Amino acid sequence: MTKQYMTHRCLIAPPEMADDFFANTVIYLARHDEEGAQGIIINRPAGIQIKELLNDLDIDADNVNPHEVLQGGPLRPEAGFVLHTGQPTWHSSIAVGENVCITTSKDILDAIAHNEGVGRYQIALGYASWGKNQLEDEIARGDWLICDADMDLIFNLPYDDRWDAAYKKIGVDRTWLASEIGHA
């Protein structure tokens, strides 16, 4: 049987997620292969505006569209990741899905600051990562649900709506889920 990888899909935290950091999150998987997985939380604002972040990096951002930076995950919170539509045209761009790329180089930040060449995007600080077979084990335990990624979920919906929207994509009303089965 061939192993199914989940790059360009989303993980959905169950309502009773044991790990507080990942409670109520939706994680876009930018990489999943035999060595492990990496993803970006797409529904948790970091409390900083893109203009502020760009100014901190000495990038003139007077014309940037208002947008919140995301808290992408617990690892390397000082590192920036740009999840965006389009082709992998920047220095460190990698295509991860149809019309979805992730870029870590400064040249894309300059383009964002000047509203040039970047369609829809999310900037995240930090990322989540799983070692070999770790994510598969967590999914088997019921630690995560999985849904297909789409442009609305990744880029358009308000952050507060993305968790519920991910549940709707798999046809589940999360209020019906329970962490434990009762006994009569």
Swiss-Prot record:
GO cellular component, as recorded: cytosol
Domain of life according to the entry: Bacteria
InterPro entries cross-referenced by the UniProt entry: AlgH-like (IPR003774)
A Pfam family hit: DUF179
NCBIfam families, per the entry: PRK00228.1-1
Family stated for the protein in its record: Belongs to the UPF0301 (AlgH) family.
Protein name in the entry: UPF0301 protein ABAYE3454
